[in-house]
């Protein structure tokens, strides 16, 4: 995939897989916009990335904020959703319903909102990548992670 001069938007790009994706995309010549939910984590991530990488605050659990974000940024060529929803972790039978609802609202509805807002801007050659964690491939005995 050719990334030079392509706009890559990474939702949840301040740590882990998202930050690594931002670093690799920028090194390949992409114009990168990454998002974070807090100014502190966003600034920390940007400090370790090329100056060409743009950071945007985004709480994708808030529909109005997603709409503002989608209207403010340049149309993406590629969209990567890599946000963590580590708000529900532990033995499944012991997880609080409210924690599960928050996790589902973030990971499922948050991703859905961003895709709904930006998919129409993607070119035919564009892509949408949804990143999951290790728990999607191999269970950890006695735990459930959302």
Language-model features: locations:
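Conserved glycine-rich cofactor-binding loop
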Residues: 7, 14-15
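Rossmann-fold scaffold of SDR-type NAD(P)-dependent oxidoreductases
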Residues: 11, 76-85, 130
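Conserved glycine-rich Rossmann-like NAD(P)H-binding loop of the short-chain dehydrogenase/reductase
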Residues: 28-44
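Rossmann-fold cofactor-recognition segment
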Residues: 49-64
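Conserved Rossmann-fold cofactor-binding substructure of NAD(P)-dependent oxidoreductases
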Residues: 61-74
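Hydrophobic positions on the long internal alpha-helix
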Residues: 80, 110, 114-118
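Conserved mid-core segment of classical short-chain dehydrogenase/reductases
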Residues: 84-101
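Catalytic loop of short-chain dehydrogenase/reductase
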Residues: 99-104, 108, 112-113, 127-146
